[in-house]
């Protein structure tokens, strides 16, 4: 499979699948059809689209078999430095808590339950976006351009998914997109530095958990902090000499 075809297959497959679910939900809503089962199935089918087509393209373009993808997804046995790097960026991303941000009250076990939930509904996305799509882009594009391109595709995918799960109407679009842009740089930098899919999955899940349990009191300070996180991520990649070793 050629590079251009791999990109086309991934994007067309991913968006055809999730748009089809959106259209189904549009007609269900139009005719006032309510079904919890269809809602759950729609969330599952739409939610796995990026991962499913990532697996397909990984197999045909990178020749990575399904068993290897699953092994990489749960590859927790990696250098402690990789975990420290992940925690460093997460702490940096949520450092607004030191400047007036608040933590919502919750039961002690809730973050653990949410973490495992977000591995399935969140972390699994990393198979498509960081493990397959952006590495293909990086064969021809610099890190910054490929990350921005991935962000736009990932953002559109999220907006479609939020239409399916019903949260689009209450979404604070600008803060969400700014956060997603920051996450795009964090996760792509982590994958380039660690070459470990699990680190991206774990980081994605932790970010989702903390996003649900924290509130920023000063949005402008939060934006400045996120810009700083993006710059740090870019700096990390600029000093990674073997950035494209996997793809050569």
Where are these regions (language model features)?
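Membrane-interface helix/loop boundary segments of multi-pass membrane proteins
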Residues: 124-151, 192-196
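Interfacial transmembrane-helix boundary/kink motif in multi-pass membrane proteins
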Residues: 2-16, 37-47, 61-94, 138-146
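Active-site-flanking alpha-helical
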Residues: 128-137, 165, 202, 211
């Amino acid at each position: 499979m050629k590079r251009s075809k791999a990109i086309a297959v991934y994007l067309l497959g991913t968006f055809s699948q999730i748009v089809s679910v959106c259209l189904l939900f549009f007609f269900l809503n139009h005719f006032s059809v309510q079904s919890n089962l269809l809602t759950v199935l729609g969330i599952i089918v739409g939610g796995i689209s990026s991962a499913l087509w990532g697996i397909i393209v990984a197999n045909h373009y990178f020749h990575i078999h399904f068993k290897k993808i699953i092994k990489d997804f749960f590859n927790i046995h990696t250098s402690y430095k990789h975990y420290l790097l992940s925690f460093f960026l997460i702490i940096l991303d949520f450092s607004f808590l030191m400047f007036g941000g608040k933590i919502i009250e919750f039961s002690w076990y809730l973050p653990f339950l949410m973490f495992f939930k977000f591995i399935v509904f969140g972390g699994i996305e990393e198979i498509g976006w960081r493990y397959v799509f952006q590495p293909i882009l990086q064969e021809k594009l610099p890190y910054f351009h490929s990350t921005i391109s991935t962000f736009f595709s990932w953002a559109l995918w999220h907006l479609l998914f939020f239409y399916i799960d019903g949260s689009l109407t209450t979404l604070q679009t600008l803060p969400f997109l700014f956060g997603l842009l920051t996450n795009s740089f964090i996760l792509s930098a982590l994958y380039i530095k660690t070459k470990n899919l699990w680190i991206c999955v774990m980081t994605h899940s932790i970010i989702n958990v903390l996003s649900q349990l924290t509130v920023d009191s000063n949005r402008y300070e939060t934006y400045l902090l996120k810009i700083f996180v993006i710059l740090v991520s870019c700096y990390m990649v600029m000093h990674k000499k073997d950035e494209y070793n996997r793809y050569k």
